[in-house]
Amino acid sequence: MVYVNAKNYFCDSIINNTDRVLSALIKYHGLSIIAVFLLAIGLFHVALKVVSYVAVLLDVFVLPPTNYLPYGSQRGAWAVVTGASDGIGKEYARQLGLRGFNVFLISRTESKLRELAQEIAEKSKVETKFLAIDVSTDSPQNYKDIETVLETIPSVSILINNVGLSHSIPTPFLETPPAELHNIIAINNLATLKITQLIAPKIVESVKEARATKKFQKGLILTMGSFGGLLPTPLLATYSGSKAFLQHWSNALAVELAPEHVDVELVVSYLVTSAMSKVRKTSALIPNPKQFVTATLSSVGRAGGAQEKFATSTPYWSHALLHWWIAQTVGVFSKLVAGFNYKMHVDIRKRALKKQARQAAGGVADPKNTTAAREGYATESLKNETLKH
C-alpha cells in the first residue's frame, strides 16, 4: 500500500508540475494553445514511461521480499504444487517448505515425488503429501484422487499451477500431430482449470476460517505463464495460444476471487535451465530454477516487467527488463515481433530436424522426440531447446 501511494504521489507531482510549466509557456512565450496541447501530450507520455520504468526498477531491485505470514507461513497452512517433480515446480515446493508451508506435491513420477517429499520434510520440518497422476489423460479419476487427498488436509492457502507442456520441436500448426495438440491443451488448460476449480474453494474456505481466528489473512494462486503466451509465437502456435488463454483466465479469476481475499497472479517467464532443455549454463537472460523461483516468491504482488498488465508479474530481473522494453516500444502484438519470432523458430526447427536426422542415421533415438517426452506430464521449466521465447 505504501508503494502504491508513493507511485500515485509521483504521478500527481509530475502532472501538477507539467501544468505549471505549460501555463508559463502560454503566458510568457506566446505558444498557441494547439502547440501547448501537443507538447502536453508528449510530456505526459514521457512521464508515464518514466514512472513505469521506475516502477520496474523498484519492483525488481529495491523493494523487500514478500511477507508470507499473511498467507499462513509457519501457521499450519498447506501449499499445493503441480508439476512438482522437476525444475521450477520442484523448486517452488522446496522454497515454500523453507517458508514454513506444508506441501502437497502433484506430478507424474511417483519415485521423484516420494524422494522430494522426504527431502522437504527433513530439511524444512513440515508435513508433506504427494500424488502421482498423468493429467494428459484428463481422467475423472485424477480429480477424484486429488479430492481424496484434499479431504485429509485441514487448511490450504497456496496453489502453484506449474504443470505445462509444449511442442517437441517448432512445427507449423497444419503439421502438428493431433495427439500433440490434445496433450498441450489437456495439460496446460484443462488440467490447470480443473485442478484450480477443485482447490480454490478449499483456499477460500480456509481463508475465511483463518481470518475468523486471526490465524492468517489471505490465499494465493500463482499460474505459470510464458513469453510464448505474451508474444504470438509462430511454429509454437498451440502452445502460445494455450499460455495466452491462461493470461486472460488468470486475470479474470483475480477479479472474481479478490473479494474472498485470495490473490491470483500469472507469472511470466522466459527460458529457464533444466535437464530436458539441455540448456545447462545459466546466463544473464537464462536463470536456473532456484534463481527464478526465488525472484518469483520474493516479489508476489508486484508487476516487475509486466507494468502494462494487472494481476501479472514478470519477476526475474532480465526477463522483467526485456518484457518492459518490448511492451513499451514495439508492443507485444506487433507484426515486427511476430516476424522476428517466426524467423527464430524456423531456424530452431531446421537445426532440430538436422539433429534428428543425424541421430536416426546413427541409430540413436532422440529422447526429447519420443512419445513419452511429447505426451508426458512436463513442468513449465522442462522446456526443450526449441522454447527460446
UniProtKB/Swiss-Prot annotation:
GO terms for molecular function: ketoreductase activity; very-long-chain 3-oxoacyl-CoA reductase activity. Pathway: Lipid metabolism; fatty acid biosynthesis. The keyword Transmembrane helix applies. GO terms for biological process: fatty acid elongation. Its EC number is 1.1.1.330. Keywords: Endoplasmic reticulum, Fatty acid biosynthesis, Fatty acid metabolism, Lipid biosynthesis, Lipid metabolism, Membrane, NADP, Oxidoreductase, Transmembrane, Transmembrane helix. The keyword NADP applies. The active site is at Y239, K243. Its main location: endoplasmic reticulum. NADP(+) binds at V80, D134, N162, Y239, K243, V272, S274. It is found in: Endoplasmic reticulum membrane. Residues 359-389 are annotated as: Disordered. It holds the Pfam family adh_short. It is a single-pass membrane protein. It catalyses: a very-long-chain (3R)-3-hydroxyacyl-CoA + NADP(+) = a very-long-chain 3-oxoacyl-CoA + NADPH + H(+). It is an enzyme of class 1 (oxidoreductase). The chain crosses the membrane at residues 34-54. GO terms for cellular component: endoplasmic reticulum; endoplasmic reticulum membrane. InterPro entries: 3_ketoreductase_fungal (IPR027533), NAD(P)-bd_dom_sf (IPR036291), Sc_DH/Rdtase_CS (IPR020904), SDR_fam (IPR002347). Component of the microsomal membrane bound fatty acid elongation system, which produces the 26-carbon very long-chain fatty acids (VLCFA) from palmitate. Catalyzes the reduction of the 3-ketoacyl-CoA intermediate that is formed in each cycle of fatty acid elongation. VLCFAs serve as precursors for ceramide and sphingolipids. Belongs to the short-chain dehydrogenases/reductases (SDR) family. HAMAP family: 3_ketoreductase. This is Very-long-chain 3-oxoacyl-CoA reductase. It comes from Yarrowia lipolytica (strain CLIB 122 / E 150) (Yeast).
